[in-house]
Amino acid sequence: MSAPLGYDLPLCYDLIVQQLIPGYASLARLAVALLAASPRASSSGAAVLVAGCGTGAELVEARAQRPDWQLTAIDPSAEMLAASQQRLDVESISWRQTTVEDLNADGCFAGALSVLVLQSLPDDGSKLAFLTALARSLEPGGQLVLVDLMAPERSTLQSQVEAAWMGFQQASGLKAEPHDLAPLTQGLHPIGEARLTALVNAAGFGDPARIFQALGYEGFLLQRRP
């Protein structure tokens, strides 16, 4: 992801996203806790994939909660990988500058985390390819925690929700201009829950179970079918 105008994205990404997304500060902790309680990843020394590690929020939390996990962190951005590596013990994590589609790690992981990645992919086969690759990388029965911006359902409350989101940003102290935030808020491809269900089923997962929601941002627990 390119940096917003006037910002060094890896340095300020976490602060900006906390001001944009309600509950973001707790997301990494919740995602790791959910995966740590899963049947496969609860075992000592479980192999866990962080797909799209960004600046390392999920990795930091995983190291705090489950220092025994064998972590693999992937991101197509060398800049983001470098930012993550500055926050963590580089030697204790397997780092790969790649996408999950090119990882070639079939059945290698007991669990996986993907936070704010799927939303950036168009629904032209790219979302399905991403989800299929994630399912393929998991052991049968392995779980994925997926968090993304979702398309709003038709609701008479939608305008109120949008106004609340703007109010949240202002109350959080977000000072950036809209054009500065464009890479974080525009060019995204959110989908509705029905479409997500169809895609994850086609990819090899069971139905998504919602485990988090804050305005338009939702988290789901997915399990690879046997």
Regions from the PLM with identified roles:
Residues L128-P140:
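A short glycine-rich, Lys/Arg-flanked "PGG" loop and its adjoining helix->strand segment in the class I
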Residues A47-A51, T55-D102:
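Class I SAM-dependent methyltransferase SAM/SAH-binding core
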Residues G141-L149:
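Conserved beta-strand signature within the Rossmann-like core of class I S-adenosyl-L-methionine
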Residues L149-A202:
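C-terminal alpha-helical "lid/dimerization" subdomain adjacent to the S-adenosyl-L-methionine
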Residues L113:
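A conserved beta-strand element that flanks and buttresses the S-adenosyl-L-methionine
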Residues M1-S42:
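Conserved class I S-adenosyl-L-methionine
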Residues T197, A203-P226:
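Core SAM-dependent methyltransferase catalytic element
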Residues L116-S120:
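Short catalytic micro-motifs in class I SAM-dependent methyltransferases
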